[in-house]
Structures are given as C-alpha cells and as structure tokens.
Amino acid sequence: IPTAVEEFLRAYSPVFIARVTEEDTEVSGCPVSAGEWAVLAFPSANRDPDLFDRPDEVLIDREENRHSAFGLGVHRCLGSNLARLEMQIALEMWVQQFPNFELTDESAVTYSGGHVRGPRSVPIRITD
C-alpha cells in the first residue's frame, strides 16, 4: 500500500502552489511583471515523460517515484509524512472493509477546483 500511496500522490497531486513575482522576468519567452501571480503546477511535473516511464498511467507498483506532490527540498510540505500515513491507513481500512470494488465510470469522477484539488465524487460499485 505505501507504494500505491506514492503513485496516487504522483498521478493525482493535490496541491498547486502560487507565488507573487518580485521582479520583472521572462519564463519560456513570456514576460512576467513584478507583482504578478505565478502558479506552480506540481501535477504537470509529475507527468514528465523524461522523469517517469508511462507518466499518464497509474501504476500502483511503480518502483522509481520521486514525485513532487508535496514540493521538494527545504520547501517540502511539513505535513507530508502525516498525509502519507493518513492515506495509507485510509486505504488499508477501505480494502479491509470493501475488498472487491470497481470504478463504474472513470469519466464521471469530478474534482474540486482551486489550489487544493481532490475528488468530489467517485462512482464505484462494491461487488461480492
């Protein structure tokens, strides 16, 4: 389950980070003025084909998985270890209670918007 948790974090990174630029600059040929907001899309970095084999697939047994779902280095989220533990416990409890389930319609999964992203509805079928 810990490997699956890391893969879910990579594939469905929950957080976007926004920062205000301090000085005029340019990013990939686009001018950015001082005082403008920049959104750092960690989810797109976690889908980089130069870093991840089959990046658009969820592989719950993915071995190499240095994702940036919680940021990196000294700016990494302080709560990342707690979040991982909570996800692991939740998945373990779910699988114990409902060992046989399936997603009924992947296109019907909806997500919240904003800087913190998460599923709002996930249609599943619990089977015997």
Segments the model singles out, each with a brief description of its role:
Residues 1-128:
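Cytochrome P450
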